[in-house]
């Protein structure tokens, strides 16, 4: 039993209806032309018989013409009547198929060809005048169209029967074809249900020999891969965020317990525990801000407000502020002499600079020397930030832009890092079609190069 709402049912019904309509229309066109052809044949046959009768009467005298002579000139289901010029019947044919119909003829203005019905049977009537030396009168031929009507009715019957038969055949073919056509979709649906039940580890592996469904399967598998990757990233994000939040909370809890136990009576313990707790709260606040920023890293870039930012001026402004906060650090700049401007959201550009400069300062506690350079080459703007601190091992360089990744977790925590800064920076740069490269030697230097195309 086919359900009415299924694609198979709709496909079968549509194709069957189209084929049925096409066949019926084709049959009607054929019948129309056949009717005209058969009718013309009937008229030609009747006109031929009428001409034979007229020739017979004109070639002989009426006294030498018998009813058998008239009958010999006629085809089946025909009747001939001879009238004089006053409309008086003189003679009529006689055969086995006697036509019991005598039309009323207006001999004053007779119609040459007319059709009349008698007892439901149509007749073709041909009236021709006869002019000869021996006779003046009229010949009336009565030609039955009953056979013609029977043939036409038979044609309609055959057309309907053929249409119905063809419809059933097409319905069967459509059912088989629609079954084969929808089989891959049914299989895909079952596989999808199984994947929903068992998880994303099962991929949809099915070859249908149809380009469209094969493309659909490939697209579905790609989508499943992306969803699986997204779920894994989400799970990893929750785990990493929980871990990053748990550690400072545990530290705060420990010092609060310490204050509760000894801090009330010991001002030194109270002071130390409060300072450490405040530091951890600042760390949590920064982490939460960066986590909130991560939720916005896929915001439509068209929704941001752009302006033409002078890169060199912006770098000088940031360095001036940082020198006031960190007078013990040296900031060396090698800025392009050519003016460098970029259409970018100013807040994002400031954030980008602070991430890399802050990162350089964290991991260069000894030399305290930060170098910043800009240049324009091949219509590409590049910004280089270099520190001479701890450096990044080669094996870690490909992972440093991953979320929550830190080269040395214990040392990173002591520096105040949480592994989100570089991840956020890369997202910002990628929004503007740029990219970031890193070059580093352990205990020598680290250079981050930001390139905007």
From Swiss-Prot:
It catalyses: ATP + protein L-histidine = ADP + protein N-phospho-L-histidine. Residues 179-232 form the HAMP domain. It comes from the Bacteria. Gene3D superfamilies: 1.10.287.130, 6.10.340.10, Histidine kinase-like ATPase, C-terminal domain. GO terms for molecular function: ATP binding; phosphorelay sensor kinase activity. Keywords: ATP-binding, Cell membrane, Kinase, Membrane, Nucleotide-binding, Phosphoprotein, Transferase, Transmembrane, Transmembrane helix, Two-component regulatory system. It is a multi-pass membrane protein. Pfam families: ArlS_N, HATPase_c, HisKA. It is found in: Cell membrane. GO terms for cellular component: plasma membrane. Residues 240-453 form the Histidine kinase domain. The chain crosses the membrane at residues 14-34, 157-177. SUPFAM superfamilies: ATPase domain of HSP90 chaperone/DNA topoisomerase II/histidine kinase, Homodimeric domain of signal transducing histidine kinase. It is an enzyme of class 2 (transferase). The keyword Transmembrane applies. The modification Phosphohistidine is found at residue 243. Its EC number is 2.7.13.3. Its main location: membrane. Autophosphorylated. Member of the two-component regulatory system ArlS/ArlR. ArlS probably functions as a sensor protein kinase which is autophosphorylated at a histidine residue and transfers its phosphate group to ArlR. This is Signal transduction histidine-protein kinase ArlS.
